[in-house]
């Protein structure tokens, strides 16, 4: 069990989990607020 904890706390695994969460969050934000990065010309 200690080896599994050591593996899950390594940088590539944590980076993959973080980027997965971040990508999902950005996808959900774009689903509810589409084109939020485009400034409308008023």
UniProtKB/Swiss-Prot annotation:
Q: For this chain's UniProt record, which GO biological process terms are given?
A: photosynthesis
**Which positions, given as ranges, span the membrane?**
7-27
Which Gene Ontology cellular component annotation is one that this UniProt entry carries? chloroplast thylakoid membrane
Q: Where in the cell is it found?
A: Plastid, Chloroplast thylakoid membrane
Q: Which Pfam families match?
A: PSI_PsaJ (PF01701)
Q: What is its main location?
A: plastid
Listed InterPro entries: PSI_PsaJ, PSI_PsaJ_sf
Q: Which SUPFAM superfamilies has this protein been placed in?
A: Subunit IX of photosystem I reaction centre, PsaJ
Give UniProt keywords alphabetically: Chloroplast, Membrane, Photosynthesis, Photosystem I, Plastid, Thylakoid, Transmembrane, Transmembrane helix
What family does this belong to?
Belongs to the PsaJ family.
Its annotated function is as follows: May help in the organization of the PsaE and PsaF subunits.
- Stated name of the protein: Photosystem I reaction center subunit IX
Identify the coding gene. Answer: psaJ
């Amino acid at each position: 069990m200690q080896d599994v904890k050591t593996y899950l706390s390594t940088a590539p695994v944590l980076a993959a989990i973080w980027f997965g969460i971040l990508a999902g969050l950005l996808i959900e934000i774009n689903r509810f607020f589409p084109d939020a990065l485009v400034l409308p010309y008023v």
